[in-house]
Amino acid sequence: MTNLRKTHPLMKIINNSFIDLPAPSNISSWWNFGSLLGVCLIVQILTGLFLAMHYTSDTMTAFSSVTHICRDVNYGWLIRYLHANGASMFFICLFLHVGRGLYYGSYMFLETWNIGVLLLFAVMATAFMGYVLPWGQMSFWGATVITNLLSAIPYIGSDLVEWIWGGFSVDKATLTRFFAFHFILPFIIAALAGVHLLFLHETGSNNPSGLCSDADKIPFHPYYTIKDILGILLFILILTSLVLFSPDLLGDPDNYTPANPLNTPPHIKPEWYFLFAYAILRSIPNKLGGVLALVLSILVLAFIPFLHTSKQRSMMFRPFSQCLFWILVADLLTLTWIGGQPVEHPFIIIGQLASILYFLLILVLMPITSLLENNLLKW
């Protein structure tokens, strides 16, 4: 009699995805972030569900309902901070996952990569709307500033903004619809992640060398299940340490002040994981130009497979490309720092230079360097 996990229609899918899946024998810990992102999504959906049971999406009561969760609900403070810091962990894992894909040439799996870019946009949209829900000062003004950017779109801009707001300013209608979208999007993300995996399993995983690994495959279970569990344990350790010791480390103190449309905070800034894109937005004096640069800062990832000029897939054996990759990482950290600084000298010029370098590296320098390395192979 054949094993049930190999014959049962549902078990068969699980078996082919997580048990008998042939995986390259040499994939490093950088391949752990896919499973960690799955854990992040599960943590966010569960904590979010319990928060939604006590939250009210009304401008009059939203702030006090969050306070009520933290003070009166059993372990409400824990659920709230797990959700808030879980979002930060989500983005740390996302950035590392994308970075891994860039370094090792995983973007050559076109469908998987494009759905990944779509997932990144969806997670960013979800996080932005979630930040609006506590209805603190930074929630309100962040929502006002970012949604107002759509007014830069020619002809339909101002109508589009009023349509999204559900009125002439960010108000009750905006908060209610943001709550509805914030609730539904994670389930759409989960479905997209399933498609992401589906396309990945069509080709099989990439590996650090970037070479075909068909000749040397091992079963996913037990080798990579145990490896993923180790990653998950470390993830839980970091998340719980953050939640229990310094839950407000990555948040903004302004969000502990209830939203006041009559009082603008001195520095409006988003959560830390959007600061690099925010710095790129601010570095362009023109409003429409800034919005285009903001969108392109993420959308540029979709162009990367077409800018791959190297004969080798991975950067493992390409020292010049490695240098440029780490310059790109440093540049993104610089942009993140600049995004949190006030708009004044010398931060303006640093932000503009870092923004130019960001696009220059991805669109020009990396493809040219790859061509140079191809010629070096002939020596």
UniProtKB/Swiss-Prot annotation:
Pfam families with a match to the protein in the record: Cytochrom_B_C, Cytochrome_B
UniProt GO molecular function: metal ion binding; ubiquinol-cytochrome-c reductase activity
Location relative to the cell: Mitochondrion inner membrane
Membrane-crossing residue ranges in chain numbering: 33-53, 77-98, 113-133, 178-198, 226-246, 288-308, 320-340, 347-367
InterPro entries in alphabetical order: Cyt_b/b6_C, Cyt_b/b6_C_sf, Cyt_b/b6_N, Cytb/b6-like_sf, Cytochrome_b, Cytochrome_b_C_euk/bac, Cytochrome_b_N_euk/bac, Di-haem_cyt_TM
List of residues binding heme b b562: 83, 182
Membrane topology designation: Multi-pass membrane protein
Residues annotated as binding a ubiquinone: 201
Main location: mitochondrion
Gene Ontology CC entries for this record: mitochondrial inner membrane; respiratory chain complex III
Keywords of the record: Electron transport, Heme, Iron, Membrane, Metal-binding, Mitochondrion, Mitochondrion inner membrane, Respiratory chain, Transmembrane, Transmembrane helix, Transport, Ubiquinone
GO biological process terms on file: mitochondrial electron transport, ubiquinol to cytochrome c
Cofactor list: heme b
PROSITE patterns recorded: CYTB_CTER, CYTB_NTER
Top-level division of the source organism's lineage: Eukaryota
Binding-site positions, heme b b566: 97, 196
Cofactor descriptive note: Binds 2 heme b groups non-covalently.
UniProt function note: Component of the ubiquinol-cytochrome c reductase complex (complex III or cytochrome b-c1 complex) that is part of the mitochondrial respiratory chain. The b-c1 complex mediates electron transfer from ubiquinol to cytochrome c. Contributes to the generation of a proton gradient across the mitochondrial membrane that is then used for ATP synthesis.
PANTHER family to which the protein is assigned, alphabetical: CYTOCHROME B
Subunit structure, as described in the record: The cytochrome bc1 complex contains 11 subunits: 3 respiratory subunits (MT-CYB, CYC1 and UQCRFS1), 2 core proteins (UQCRC1 and UQCRC2) and 6 low-molecular weight proteins (UQCRH/QCR6, UQCRB/QCR7, UQCRQ/QCR8, UQCR10/QCR9, UQCR11/QCR10 and a cleavage product of UQCRFS1). This cytochrome bc1 complex then forms a dimer.
Homology family: Belongs to the cytochrome b family.
Remaining remarks: Heme 1 (or BL or b562) is low-potential and absorbs at about 562 nm, and heme 2 (or BH or b566) is high-potential and absorbs at about 566 nm.
Protein's name according to its UniProt entry: Cytochrome b
